[in-house]
Amino acid sequence: MLVSIVVPVYNEEENIAIFYNAVTKVMSGLSYEYELIYVDDGSTDSSVVILREIAKLDARVKVVLLARNFGHQTALTCGLDYAKGDAVITMDGDMQHPPALIPELIRLWENGYDVVRTIRDSTEDASWAKSFTSKYYYKLMNKMADVPIVEGGSDFRLMNRKSLE
C-alpha cells in the first residue's frame, strides 16, 4: 500500500532538509511505500532549488510548482490532486506538525478510520492576544456554522482514498 504525504511550501528553504530527513527517518521504520509531494506555492527564496535537488536524489519525492502564491489551502488541494496513495497525509513543512506522529495516524487508519485529524492541545507559544482572539473566533464560527468547528484543528491529518473521492 502507498502513503502519500502532501506538503505545501512557501519560502521554507531553512526547513526543507530538516523536514525531509525527519519524514524519511519516520517512514523508514514503517512497512509502507510512500511518496512525498511538495507543492511550492510561489516561493521567492531557494525552496524550489532545494526541492528539485532532493527530488533528483529520491524518486519518492515529487515537486509541484504553482505559478504564483495562491495560498496555503490551494497548495494543499493541488497536492491532494496529485496524491496517488491509499492514505494521504497533509502536513506543513515547517516542523509545526511533528513527523514523529505519522505512525500514530497510520495506526489509526489501519484500525479502520477513514479520516484521522490532529488538534493542537497547547497554546503556550501563543501570545495572550492570539489565544483570546482564537478562542472567540471559534465561538463565533460555531454559532454561525451548521457543522461544528473544532478549536485547535489543523491541516495535519490522514485521509483514506475513499474519503478523498
Locations of the language-model features?
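Short, well-formed alpha-helical segments that are part of the catalytic scaffolds
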Residues: 12-27
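Acidic helix N-cap motif at the loop->helix transition within catalytic regions
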Residues: 14-18, 44-54
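Short helix-capping segments at alpha-helix termini
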Residues: 27-32, 55-60
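Short beta-strand/loop segment that forms part of the nucleotide-sugar
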Residues: 32-42, 64-65
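A conserved acidic beta->alpha catalytic loop
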Residues: 40-48, 95-96
